[in-house]
Amino acid sequence: MESRKKFSALAALIGIVCANGAYACTGITLKSKDNGVVTARTIEWGESEMENMYTIVPRGYIQQSMLPNGDTGGLTFSSMYGYVGLAVVQPGWVVDGMNEAGLSAGLFYFPGYGQYPEYNPSDAARTISDFQLVSWILSRFSTVDQVRAAINNIRVTSIDPRASTAHWRVTDASGAQIIIEITNGRANVYDSKLGVLTNSPDYPWQLRNLNNYVNLIPGTAGPVQFGPITLRAFGAGSGFLGLPGDFTPPSRFVRAAFLQNYSIQQDTSYDSAMQAFHILNNFDVPLGTEYAPGRAPVNMPSATQWTIATDMHDKVVYYNTMYNRTLRSIDLNKIDFANIAFQSHPLDTVRAETIIPVQINGAPTNR
């Protein structure tokens, strides 16, 4: 009875979140000169704070998937690899993270285009909820080829019919990356050589749409003779004139692709992780911009709830949040995944920016 009550509460919450809100996720991938790979992404939800937390999962930890209607007996899996993930709503719903083998995985909303297989109670033992798929991937695999081989052995479902479907990005330490989209009840696995992912439409469509922007170039367009007058750019950056700036998934995909592709390659994976946060600043969604007039979310500083970068070379997870833009890090090398206990903690212990006063020479220090 207690587990069914828990299911009902979680299903209601995630159903409301996915059905009624505006959500926007933007992901990029950077590779450094030292052969390091960094994946980074934002997560947006502008209705309310999503109970964001980080979760540490040890080796050998056993999880069982939730199922529709509060059914029990979902896919049970034990962690071959320890991992760290950023979760929403409850600790097992890891949205993005990395395991000790350097495999990164993330969930991105995919409304209107995904179609999971119809839930069949007779297949409960190999059925997993979409919000637990990242945990399954991080706990069981070290390469994208392993994930590719296993993904169609399970059945992915949503615990609430109102919820949006999702698609997933998986990257390993070699830089290999795949996108998983479930349509017509079957997983389609795409090699992702570009490294960018947002939301709907489907990934092949997003790639084709890039062809609309073949005219964009980095830098400044040169002067053009226009009859008797000479046309000149007003300022730097005119080569990107026409780059989409709105918050729709296709526009964010194009913008992320161009900013990622033309950003300067960094020397180290650490530098790439720092660069990723600068790039993703372009995708912060100011609170209220995705809503109709009069529908104003309250008690939140931003619709971009958090941003994460996973450094698969150094095995460090970095994040900041809407409450505190100061970067925090979790070094997987310093975690004994054989002995640490499963645990989960809020991303912010204090919901306030870290502001460091500048001490002015000669000014009083007691203020």
Where are the predicted features?
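Compact, glycine/acidic-enriched structural inserts
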Residues: 55-71, 114-154, 341-351
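Sec/Tat signal peptide C-region and signal peptidase I cleavage site
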Residues: 18-24
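A contiguous strand-loop segment
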Residues: 26-122, 162
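Short helix/loop capping segments that flank catalytic or ligand/cofactor-binding pockets
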Residues: 48-49, 115-116, 178-181, 188-192, ...
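C-terminus-biased signal that marks the final domain/tail of proteins
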Residues: 24-38, 46, 52, 150, ...
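Bacterial N-terminal signal peptides that target proteins for export
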Residues: 1-10
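Aromatic- and glycine-enriched pocket-lining scaffold segments that form the walls
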Residues: 144, 148-182
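Structural recognition of the beta-strand scaffold that forms the well-ordered cores
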Residues: 38-40, 104-107, 169, 179, ...
